């Protein structure tokens, strides 16, 4: 993948994906959203990408998710999704740094695994004290 240097550092230029307003960005039709109180949208700032659900890629702009969870007394998070080595890992690491207990459910994730990125992500998450398991364990 190509990269670009932005104000906040090097950014990977991913192929277009999860474009707002397309099926690729839509929540699954079988997902029950009647009780959803918050949807965090990320990666929509033109000049700043976003891997984490907690902090934009500039590492300075919070999404508000940590405060939202704290206000509701939530202390433990389960991370799932795409891609394990980027969005899931960054979100899990930022959640851990914000003081949450975090578990990544491995069989509910999928990685890109480019240039050893998956091994590095698991190593970083392990070093941060993030639990790793499969869905049957939770």
Role assignments for model-derived ranges:
Residues 96:
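Gly/Ala-rich phosphate-binding loop of Rossmann-like dinucleotide-binding domains
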Residues 26-38, 113-138:
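Structural recognition of alpha->loop->beta junctions
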Residues 74-90, 104-110:
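Glycine-rich anion-binding loop/nest that anchors nucleotide
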Residues 3, 8, 17, 100-108, ...:
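Feature captures the catalytic ectodomains and active-site-proximal regions of enzymes
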Residues 42, 105-107, 135:
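Generic beta-sheet signal
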Residues 1-76:
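Active-site alpha/beta core segments
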């Amino acid at each position: 993948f190509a990269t670009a240097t932005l104000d906040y550092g090097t950014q990977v230029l991913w192929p277009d994906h999860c474009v707002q307003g397309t099926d690729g960005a839509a929540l699954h039709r079988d997902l029950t959203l009647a009780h959803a109180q918050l949807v965090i949208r990320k990666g929509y700032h033109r000049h700043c990408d976003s891997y984490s659900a907690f902090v934009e890629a500039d590492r300075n702009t919070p999404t508000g998710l940590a405060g939202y969870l704290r206000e509701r007394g939530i202390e433990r998070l389960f991370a799932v999704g795409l891609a394990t080595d980027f969005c899931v890992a960054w979100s899990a690491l930022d959640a851990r740094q914000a003081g949450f207990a975090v578990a990544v459910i491995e069989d509910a994730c999928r990685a890109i695994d480019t240039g050893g990125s998956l091994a590095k992500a698991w190593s970083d998450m392990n070093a941060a004290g993030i639990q790793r398991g499969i869905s049957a364990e939770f």
